[in-house]
Amino acid sequence: MGFGFKILVEQSIQLLTVAPRLVPEVLQQPTIRHPIAVSLGAIAGALSRYYLSLWFAQRFGITFPYGTLFINITGCLAMGFFYALALERLSLISPEIRLLVAVGFLGAYTTFSTYALDTFTLLGDRNLLAAGFYWAGSSILGVISIQIGIILGRLCQ
């Protein structure tokens, strides 16, 4: 997963940052480039989410949504870090790369609709303690992780 993801990201960045004279005219238009960037990021984000969820389910079982909890927290951390890095420090990052990472990858990687469904399922199973921990833990730790990510992003020079 890690090696393939790295290649996908490197190729995506290369595709989106190649010299304009080498790119067909149609690909120079933001109305084409932006959806391509989002799509490439979304593929990587969705696959990362899928494989991490499988790993957590195989490792810890399915009685508690550990994978979704981990994904939501790390996604918030990454979003905070990228926000601080891309918007506050490195304004040279192209709009396509920002879309690829923030909207595409992280948008597909962290979906709170799964969070809501998992909470609902735990409540339906009458597992109130786990449902309460999961519901509050995802929200509280997500907000804390955003803040930590921003702090870490601001520390990068």
UniProtKB/Swiss-Prot annotation:
<feature type="binding site">
    <location>
        <position position="107"/>
    </location>
    <ligand>
        <name>Na(+)</name>
    </ligand>
</feature>
<comment type="similarity">
    <text>Belongs to the fluoride channel Fluc/FEX (TC 1.A.43) family.</text>
</comment>
<dbReference type="InterPro" id="IPR003691">
    <property type="entry name" value="FluC"/>
</dbReference>
<feature type="transmembrane region" description="Helical">
    <location>
        <begin position="132"/>
        <end position="152"/>
    </location>
</feature>
<dbReference type="GO" id="GO:0046872">
    <property type="term" value="F:metal ion binding"/>
</dbReference>
<feature type="transmembrane region" description="Helical">
    <location>
        <begin position="67"/>
        <end position="87"/>
    </location>
</feature>
<keyword id="KW-0406">Ion transport</keyword>
<dbReference type="GO" id="GO:0062054">
    <property type="term" value="F:fluoride channel activity"/>
</dbReference>
<keyword id="KW-0472">Membrane</keyword>
<feature type="transmembrane region" description="Helical">
    <location>
        <begin position="100"/>
        <end position="120"/>
    </location>
</feature>
<keyword id="KW-0812">Transmembrane</keyword>
<protein>
    <recommendedName>
        <fullName>Fluoride-specific ion channel FluC</fullName>
    </recommendedName>
</protein>
<dbReference type="GO" id="GO:0005886">
    <property type="term" value="C:plasma membrane"/>
</dbReference>
<feature type="binding site">
    <location>
        <position position="110"/>
    </location>
    <ligand>
        <name>Na(+)</name>
    </ligand>
</feature>
<keyword id="KW-1003">Cell membrane</keyword>
<feature type="transmembrane region" description="Helical">
    <location>
        <begin position="36"/>
        <end position="56"/>
    </location>
</feature>
<keyword id="KW-0813">Transport</keyword>
<dbReference type="GO" id="GO:0140114">
    <property type="term" value="P:cellular detoxification of fluoride"/>
</dbReference>
<keyword id="KW-0997">Cell inner membrane</keyword>
<keyword id="KW-0479">Metal-binding</keyword>
<comment type="function">
    <text>Fluoride-specific ion channel. Important for reducing fluoride concentration in the cell, thus reducing its toxicity.</text>
</comment>
<dbReference type="Pfam" id="PF02537">
    <property type="entry name" value="CRCB"/>
</dbReference>
<keyword id="KW-1133">Transmembrane helix</keyword>
<keyword id="KW-0915">Sodium</keyword>
<keyword id="KW-0407">Ion channel</keyword>
